[in-house]
């Protein structure tokens, strides 16, 4: 009997308590009728003395914890894990990464701190997940699509932009930016700076006895307001393709002064020299910076015969006819494809200069002159140029005081031009008759896809019928995109002389 109890206790620990209880209960009371079938009686055990059943803790009984990526059955960490932890802790002093196996590299990168010095990580780590963590730690909103889809490029571009926006000439050490260039030169392709701070100068208050004998205050030296000079920066970025600048000051508060918003001649000459020497620059934007005719011509002169420049944006400035003439000269001395002079002071003479250049141009595909004042004289000149131009696809003339004479000539353009796909004449005075003229021109046009005539005094019927013609053109363009082979076979069958539309 004892042997049976012992064996059952080894096989089933829960049964041992029952057998022991049976033995203790029968030891004190001997049955007079002889041995009887034993009826085990279980005495309640107090909660304090109750031992938990091993199966009660389900987590302890599981052999694999799949939801824990760090779980390991081994009680002692593997030597490789200990080495990886040591490398992570001492990565700043001894950056070991390339010599490791790929799976070990990934473990190290997943646990590296985003606060490591850029001198250690910039040219060593290319893993996008690491730079994703660096970006998300610094900026709550991240549009990686604006940076070519690369988190590493985004980090260095925004980090450099942040340094430039808070650089104070005469106060900030230029080495802060210059030391960064060797680390980011291979990754920065776009620089967008919407603020340039002027020098911090506390003007000395004159006392009554401090004035000169003549009493003139003109001998006082004017405080300089030149901003950070971009020459060294642009020269150090060997892959720079886009430069987007705004000489402005944000959040100036009670320290507001008009000279905080000056784009000085020294700034202009320095910037012109920098972009002239940058032979990789494709897009240049200088907006909302109070650029007048003289400064615009300095900038444009530096861009003549630029090898790769494709887009120039000088919108929201103070450029007049002289600046527009400089831009017209640039059209035929560059590979410019997009020109934006919106919200400036260009009038009819400037528009005529642009029209003369446009008539012989073979590169420009987009011209934006909205919110100027070219009037009908300038609008008619542009319409005449479009009768011979074969490359422009987008024309924006909104808010230019245009009226029926310009609409009449544009209707003739619509009948013969086969390259324009978008025209904007909103916020003008086209009128009822002008709308009818444009509708007549649209009846022969098969390529225009967008035509904005809002707030131009065109009759609703004319606007509706023009919209129907545009819808037919868009549907035909969609069919051509879906079946290009069928479209080409139709052109071949009809001959090139009937291929228009």
Swiss-Prot record:
The lineage of its organism: Eukaryota, Metazoa, Chordata, Craniata, Vertebrata. Keywords: Cell projection, Cilium, Cytoplasm, Cytoskeleton, Flagellum, Leucine-rich repeat, Repeat. This is Dynein regulatory complex subunit 5. Residues 1-23, 35-49 have a biased composition (Polar residues). The gene is TCTE1. It is found in: Cell projection, Cilium, Flagellum; Cytoplasm, Cytoskeleton, Flagellum axoneme. Residues 24-34 have a biased composition (Low complexity). One of its GO terms (biological process) is flagellated sperm motility. CDD domains: LRR_RI. GO terms for cellular component: cytoplasm; cytoskeleton; sperm flagellum. InterPro entries: DRC5, Leu-rich_rpt, LRR_dom_sf. Its main location: other. LRR repeats lie at residues 308-321, 335-355, 363-383, 391-411, 419-439. Pfam families: LRR_6. It comes from Macaca fascicularis (Crab-eating macaque). Belongs to the DRC5 family. Component of the nexin-dynein regulatory complex (N-DRC) a key regulator of ciliary/flagellar motility which maintains the alignment and integrity of the distal axoneme and regulates microtubule sliding in motile axonemes. May play a role in the assembly of N-DRC. May be required for sperm motility. It comes from the Eukaryota.
């Amino acid at each position: 009997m004892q042997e049976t109890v012992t064996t059952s206790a080894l096989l089933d620990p829960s049964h041992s308590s029952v057998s022991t209880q049976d033995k203790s209960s029968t030891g004190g009371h001997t049955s007079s009728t002889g041995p009887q079938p034993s009826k085990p009686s279980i005495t309640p055990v107090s909660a304090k003395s109750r031992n938990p059943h091993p199966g009660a803790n389900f987590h302890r009984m599981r052999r694999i914890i799949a939801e824990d990526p760090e779980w390991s059955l081994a009680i002692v960490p593997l030597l490789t894990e200990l080495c990886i932890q040591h490398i992570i802790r001492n990565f700043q002093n001894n950056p070991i990464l390339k010599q490791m196996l790929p799976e070990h590299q990934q473990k190290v990168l997943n646990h590296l701190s985003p606060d490591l010095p850029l001198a250690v990580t910039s040219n060593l780590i290319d893993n996008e997940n690491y730079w994703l963590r660096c970006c998300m730690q610094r900026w709550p909103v991240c549009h990686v699509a604006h940076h070519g889809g690369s988190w590493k490029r985004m980090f260095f571009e925004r980090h450099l932009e942040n340094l430039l926006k808070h650089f104070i000439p005469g106060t900030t050490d230029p080495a802060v930016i210059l030391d960064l260039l060797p680390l980011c030169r291979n990754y920065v392709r776009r620089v967008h700076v919407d603020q340039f701070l002027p020098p911090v100068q506390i003007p000395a208050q004159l006392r009554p006895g401090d004035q000169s004998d003549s009493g003139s205050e003109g001998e006082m030296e004017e405080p300089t307001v030149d901003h950070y000079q971009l020459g060294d920066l642009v020269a150090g970025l060997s892959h720079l393709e886009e430069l987007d600048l705004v000489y402005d000051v944000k959040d100036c508060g009670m320290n507001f002064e008009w000279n905080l918003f000056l784009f000085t001649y020294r700034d202009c000459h320095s910037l012109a020299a920098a972009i002239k020497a940058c032979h990789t620059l494709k897009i240049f934007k200088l907006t909302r910076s109070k650029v007048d005719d003289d400064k615009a011509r300095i900038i444009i002169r530096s861009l003549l015969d630029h090898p790769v420049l494709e887009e120039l944006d000088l919108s929201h400035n103070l450029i007049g006819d002289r600046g527009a003439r400089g831009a017209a000269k640039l059209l035929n001395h560059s590979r410019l494809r997009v020109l934006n002079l919106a919200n400036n002071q260009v009038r009819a003479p400037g528009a005529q200069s642009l029209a003369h250049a446009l008539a012989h141009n073979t590169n420009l595909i987009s011209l934006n002159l909205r919110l100027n004042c070219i009037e009908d004289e300038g609008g008619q000149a542009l319409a005449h140029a479009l009768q011979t131009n074969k490359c422009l696809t987008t024309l924006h003339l909104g808010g230019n005081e245009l009226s029926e004479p310009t609409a009449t000539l544009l209707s003739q353009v619509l009948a013969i031009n086969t390259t324009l796909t978008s025209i904007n004449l909103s916020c003008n005075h086209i009128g009822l008759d002008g709308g009818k003229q444009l509708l007549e021109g649209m009846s022969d046009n098969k390529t225009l896809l967008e035509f904005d005539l809002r707030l131009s005094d065109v009759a609703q019927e004319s606007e509706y019928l023009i919209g129907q013609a545009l819808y037919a053109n868009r549907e035909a363009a969609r069919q051509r995109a879906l079946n290009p082979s069928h479209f080409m076979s139709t052109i071949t069958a009809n001959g090139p002389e009937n291929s228009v539309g």
